[in-house]
C-alpha cells in the first residue's frame, strides 16, 4: 500500500474528516522528519510506515478532543507531535509548540516555515519558566507524569480550559497521585490503526 493510501485508510478508519490538501501536508511533514532526523535526533523511528502510524495517526487521535478551542499549547513538543499534525488539520486553532531542546525547536521553526503554518508559534524554554502563553487546552504526548504535567503548566491554562494528556497504558497510579484540585473529566482509550499498543487520552480540569 502506498503511503498516501495508508494515511487515507487510517484517517477513514478513525472516522476523521481531513482534506486531501491537509493529508498531503502531513506527508510533507513526514518527509521533513526523515530529512532532518539525523541532524536533530527527532525520532527513533526510521521506517516511513511506522512514522505515519506513530507520528501522524497517533497525533490525530487528539482532534476530536480539541473541538471548539481557539488556542492550544503542546508541551514537550519534540519533533512536533501532536502539535504539528493538529495544526495542519485545524488551521483555525492557534497552536504554540514548546520544547526546552533548542535543536528540536530549530527543527520546529523550519517545519512551520516549510509547511506554511501561520497558526503556529514555536517557543524554546523550560515550561516552568514560560509565562507569556495562555491556552484553552494544554496537551502533551508522553511528556511527564500527570501530577508533574499539571503542576508545571497550570499557569499557562486559561480559565475554563483543560489538559489533554496523551498516554500509553491506562495511567491508574498517575491518576491516583493527582492533586485534590484537579478533576478527571474523562479517560478514553484511543484506537490507532496499525499500532499494536495501548493508547489513552486523559482530560483534566481545575476544580
Swiss-Prot record:
Q: Name the gene that codes for it.
A: rsmG
Q: Which PANTHER family match?
A: S-ADENOSYL-L-METHIONINE-DEPENDENT METHYLTRANSFERASES SUPERFAMILY PROTEIN
Record CDD domains = AdoMet_MTases
For S-adenosyl-L-methionine, which residues are the binding ones?
76, 81, 127-128, 141
Any one GO CC term of the record: cytosol
- What this protein is called in its record is Ribosomal RNA small subunit methyltransferase G
Q: Which HAMAP family match?
A: 16SrRNA_methyltr_G (MF_00074)
This molecule's function is given as: Specifically methylates the N7 position of guanine in position 527 of 16S rRNA.
Answer whether the UniProt record assigns the keyword Transport to this protein. Answer: no
Q: Where in the cell is it found?
A: Cytoplasm
Q: Which NCBIfam families match?
A: rsmG_gidB
Enzyme Commission number: 2.1.1.170
Q: Which GO terms describe its molecular function?
A: rRNA (guanine-N7-)-methyltransferase activity
Q: Which reaction does it catalyse?
A: guanosine(527) in 16S rRNA + S-adenosyl-L-methionine = N(7)-methylguanosine(527) in 16S rRNA + S-adenosyl-L-homocysteine
Q: What lineage is this protein's organism placed in? A: Bacteria, Pseudomonadati, Pseudomonadota, Betaproteobacteria, Neisseriales
Chief location category: cytoplasm
> Family assignment?
Belongs to the methyltransferase superfamily. RNA methyltransferase RsmG family.
Keywords in alphabetical order: Cytoplasm, Methyltransferase, rRNA processing, S-adenosyl-L-methionine, Transferase
Cite the InterPro entries for this sequence: rRNA_ssu_MeTfrase_G (IPR003682), SAM-dependent_MTases_sf (IPR029063)
